[in-house]
Design a protein with these regions (language model features):
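Polytopic alpha-helical membrane-helix bundles and their juxtamembrane interface segments
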Residues: 1-22, 26, 33, 67-72, ...
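Individual alpha-helical transmembrane segments in multi-pass integral membrane proteins
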Residues: 7, 49-58, 164-165
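Helix-loop junctions on the outward
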Residues: 22-25, 37-52
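Interfacial loop at the N-terminal end of multi-pass membrane proteins
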Residues: 39-40, 44-46, 56-59, 74-80
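Membrane-water interface of transmembrane alpha-helices
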Residues: 54-71
C-alpha cells in the first residue's frame, strides 16, 4: 500500500462523504480522487477501471454543473426519483455494457476482465444517476461496494479495500439522507 494510493483513497472517501451531504465540494474532490486512482488502477492492470476514472472525471465536471444549475430555471438540482421507464432502460443498458466490456477485456491483458467489466458498467450508470441526484444511485453504489471490498482484498489492494468498505457505509448513509431530503422537499 503506497502513500499515493492512500491519498487517492482518502480523497475518494471525502468526495463520497460530501456527496451524502449534497455538498458541491464532492465534485472537485472527486476530480482529484479519480486522477490519482487512474494511475494506481493502471499499475494493477485494471484497464476498464482506468477508463472508468476518465469517465468519472467527465461526469464529475457534469455533476458539478448539474448540482448547481440543473434544476428548474437553472437553479440548484433537487433529489428526485428515477422514472420507471428510465430505470428499466438503465438496467438493460448496464447488462449490455457489462457483456460488451467483458468481451473486449477478455481479449486484453486485463487482470480480472469480468469483475472489471461489472465495475465499469454499473459504476457508469451509478455515477450518472448521482450527477442527476436520483436517490436510487445509492443502492446501486451499495451493490458495487459489496463486490469491491472482497475483490480488492483478494488482489491485495488494501487501501482501496478500506476505501470501498467506507464507501459501503457512506452509501447506506447517503441513501438514508437523500431519501429524507426527498421526503422533506415533497
Amino acid at each position: 500500500m503506497s502513500p499515493f494510493e492512500v491519498v487517492a483513497a482518502a480523497f475518494g472517501i471525502v468526495s463520497v462523504f460530501l456527496s451524502t451531504r449534497q455538498n458541491i465540494w464532492s465534485w472537485p474532490t472527486s476530480l482529484i480522487n479519480v486522477s490519482m486512482s487512474s494511475i494506481v488502477y493502471f499499475q494493477q492492470r485494471l484497464y476498464a477501471t482506468v477508463i472508468l476514472q476518465g469517465f468519472f472525471f467527465v461526469v464529475s465536471v457534469y455533476g458539478w454543473y448539474e448540482w448547481l444549475f440543473g434544476g428548474e430555471r437553472k437553479t440548484e438540482l433537487k433529489v428526485s426519483r428515477i422514472r420507471p421507464a428510465l430505470g428499466g432502460a438503465l438496467v438493460g443498458l448496464t447488462a449490455l455494457a457489462t457483456l460488451g466490456s467483458w468481451y473486449v477485456l477478455s481479449r486484453t491483458p486485463d487482470s480480472h476482465p469480468l469483475i472489471d467489466a461489472v465495475f465499469f458498467a454499473v459504476s457508469v450508470v451509478a455515477q450518472w444517476m448521482m450527477a442527476r441526484k436520483y436517490v436510487e444511485c445509492w443502492p446501486v453504489w451499495v451493490a458495487i461496494n459489496c463486490i469491491a471490498v472482497p475483490f480488492f482484498f483478494l488482489i491485495h489492494s488494501y487501501a482501496f479495500m478500506i476505501q470501498y468498505a467506507v464507501f459501503l457505509g457512506l452509501a447506506i448513509m447517503g441513501w438514508r439522507q437523500w431519501k429524507a431530503s426527498l421526503v422533506a422537499s415533497s
